[in-house]
Structures are given as structure tokens and as C-alpha cells.
Amino acid sequence: MLNKLINRLKSLFPGRQLGAYSLVGVWNTLFGYGLYAALVWGLDGKLKFAYMWANVLSNFIAITQAFFLYKFFVFKTKGHYWQEYIKCWMVYGAAALIGLAVLPLLVETLRALLPLAYKTYAPYAGGALLTALTVLCSFLGLKNFSFRTVENSLLSRVKERWALQTQPQRRVMFLGLILAAGFLIALAVCALGLILHWQYYPYTTFLFDPRYRFTDLYETLILARGHTAGLNYFPLLMGFMRAVSQGPERILCAVFVSLWVAFYVSIVYKGLPQLPHKAGWTVLLAVGSFPLWFLADRANLEGFVFMACAGFVISFWRGRMNWAAFWLALAVNMKPHPAVFMVLFLRDKQYKALAKWLVLCVLIGALCSWAAHFDWLSFQRNVQTFSDWQQFLPFGLEFSHTFFNLLRLPVFLATQNGLPDSWQATVAFSRLVAPGYAVAMLGLFAFISAHVVFVRPAFWKALLLLTLAEVFFPFVSHDYTLIHLILPVLFFLNAPPMPPKQSVFITVCLAVLLIPMNFWTHSFYHSLMYDLVLNAGTFLRPLAAGVLLAYLLKDFSFARLKTGIKNYFSAKK
């Protein structure tokens, strides 16, 4: 194992470069960290978050002197000063940007862990840990990008390896890289917000909203203990929560969140096509999937709905229709929106499975209502209150990413001339367009259903169309419901080859729906009871979903639909 590692290092560092790089690297490390420590010492007490300013200033000076040392003593390239200096900044600057986001996490964690007498040393220890993580990555970036030649070009090797991959493998890599870039941008914006606003997460938004940490689970437990109907949850989910509500809240939260994350990661791993370093790409896709972390951050019970929907999709794909009917009945008895997937039974003429699903829905609902003493009148009032609160008032704009919010958002922004005028205008507009919106979405869903049943697009496309309808068509649909998108995404990644432009376009649209966007926010209203903070996702995600929906239906024609209807009813099962 050790010999293999040594040989690998020799292949990366030909000739004397390893020794020269080591000497220069040691000097750069000592110089950079010494300058950082000196600036921390000098600025401490004069500026808030002095270690952040020290990190920025020391990086600027250290990167410039490192450029000359690497150019003249390690890689010994000729000319191209400005080009190589800019490239050097691109390598070191990227590392510095990531470090700028990671440094406060290290420092604040060390401050929390260190004894009181040593807390003042946290910035120095955090800087040392961060420095140790960047040495090897910096060399690879400098050698293969800043001072590269044609012979040692990492880019050329990447192109060669890319050419050997199948199109499904390329989709995985492309999607993973976009998700990773989105995650790093979120980190960078978090660090920038820290510098500009002098606040550190969780006082500023990163991937989540820190005001509601695990609140969905805790509120549901409180409701379950009071034996009242819970928000918009159906009897099955509330009955389960009542059964476990007497347990310790933190343990329940840890168990549920761990279960959802582990299930999500395992689904991604099993669903990816075979490719090199599959485990690494699985981690990359999971870490970059914002809906998973938002669901975990809120500890929302949508995780159980997702598990049931995943069970349905897997069972349906494998032809186990009885299990598919069972899992879909469980999902619908937790929340109604997964009922859209019953269209797949019609698509494959699985009428018996459809009938079994309907019977199971009634039986499970009746049994859970009886066992949990479910109060349907209170449930109806709670649903109505929740709908009025989220559907008509501007509060629903904060986390909801539906097409309905896409219509309301311009009205709210255009009437921001002071409260309560903007609220009244938004409420009036919401009530005005709500009936028409409901009719339009029902009509669009009927159109999509007809397309799925009679035209019979590929399974991944049918599943994606129905999932988009499930997530974006309702009046209210919060960010964590986007977790369902990973199911059609995995089938798309395994789809047969298609035109490259089509593959790239769909991959980009799906990535936009999954990357974090909550870091781009603006606060419109603040009170002791509630803050209204709009984020970019409430606008960009429905927009991307609309574009993707139109693209998936671009080949529709009434002639094909007519032919499909004729074939559907004339062909044998």
C-alpha cells in the first residue's frame, strides 16, 4: 500500500519538482501562516472577526510572492507573466475562497470546544488546520493549470477520459460538477455575507433558514401530544407521530434525519449507472442536493413521503404492481400530492393494481383514522387556515416555489411602497387569480396525463413530468418537496443515448432545481413573531421548471395523441 502511494506521488511529481516544490511549499506555508497569525494578533480587538480580515490580506500578499517562487524555482516556465499570474490567482484564489468560508466554521467550532483559557487561540489553530488542507491541492492546480505544458496538461487527460465515458456516465459527471459548483458558491456567498454584514451563520442564511431549525418535527410532536389534527398531515402520518411522540425529541430528530439522509444516499448509489469512482459521485450528488439538506434542517416529515414514493417507483419499475399499489397508498395517506403517480397505472393498463390502490387508500385511511381518533373537522379547519396563510398572504412567498407564487411575486415586489398596502395588493391578487389558477393547473395536469398515457414517452420522461406536476402545480409546495425530483433524475441519468444538446439542456435544468439558492435573500418584513425573507429559489426554480416542462412537451402533437388514443383502446393489454 505504501509503495503504491509512493509510486503515485512520483508519477504526479516528475524529476526534481517534488523536492523543489516541497522547499518552496514549506516556505510559503510558514510565510503565509506567519503573516496570517501576525495580522490576527495586530487586528484582534480592533475589528470584528479579525481573523477573516487577516485571512484576506495574508492571502493577497502570500499568493503574489508564491507566484514568483513557483515560476522561477519550481516549474521554470518562460514568459507569460500576466497569464500565469492570473491563472495562479485562479488556483490559489479558489482555494482561498473556499478557505474563507471554511475558516469561520473551524474557528467557531474550536471556540466552542476549547477550554475558556484557550479560546483566544482558536483563530490561530483554525488557520493552521486550514493551511494543512490546501498544500497538495494547490500543487496539483499549479502544475496542471497555472504552469502547465502540453505534455503534463491535466485538461488533456480529462478530455481523454471524458471521451471514453458513455453518455449516461457523462450526465452523472456533469450533474455532479454543477451541484458541487452550486454548493461552493453557497459557501462563498456565506463568507461574503459574513464580511459585509459582520454576522456569522446561523445569524445569516447559508443553505437553510436558521430561524426554523428542526421546527417542523418539533411542532408536529407538540400537536401529536395534544391529540389534535396536525397541519396538513393525513391520519397515517399523524397516527405514527402520536405513537412516537412521547420519546425524547432530540433522539427522535436524530433518528429520523439520519434515516432520511441514509435512505437518500443509498437510493442515489443504487440508481447511478456504473462508472469509475461511483461512491465519490454519489457523495457529490448527495452533498450538492439542496432539498435533502433543507428537509434535514427543517426535519420535515416529507422524508417519509419520499420513502414511500421511492418504494412505489422501484416496485413499479420492477413490475411488482401489488407492492407499487401498497407504497403509493401509504404515500397518499400521508400527503395527497403523490396521487399524481396513479397515472402510471393507466399508462401500462394496470387496472387491477389501480383498483387495489384505491381500496388500500380507503382501508389505510379508515384504519388510521379509527386508531388515531383522528378529528377530521379540526383537520379541515387546520388545512383551511394553513392554505389561507400560505396561499393568500405574502408569508407563502418565503419557501414556496410553485407556479402560483411565480404569478404572485411580481405583484408583491411592484407594490412594495409600505405595509400594509403591499400585503393588501398581494392578498387581493391571490384571491382573484386562485380560481383561474386551479382550473388551469387541473387542465394542464389532464393534458400531461393524456400525454403520458396515450403518447407513452420514455419512463424517465413520464416520471419527470408527473413529478414536476406534483411539486410545482399546487398552491403551496415548500422547498423540501423538491427531494422527489431525485427519482426521475436517476432514471434520466440511466436513459439511453440522446442528442448531446438535449442531454446537456435537461441536465442543466435539473441541476438548477437541485442547487442551493436560499443564500440569495432579501428581507421585506421583520417582527418579533415573523420575518418575511424572500430567496432566489422562489423565483428561479419555478422558472426553470416551466422551461423544462415546455421542453419535455415540445414534441407533442394532436395527431400523435389521436393515434395514441386509438392504439391504447384497440391494442390488447
Give the positions of each predicted feature.
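Hydrophobic core segments of transmembrane alpha-helices in multi-pass, intramembrane catalytic enzymes
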Residues: 62, 301-310, 336-339, 481-490, ...
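Juxtamembrane helix-capping/reentrant segments at transmembrane boundaries
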Residues: 78-95
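Transmembrane helices and adjacent periplasmic/lumenal helix-loop junctions
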Residues: 328-345, 473-484
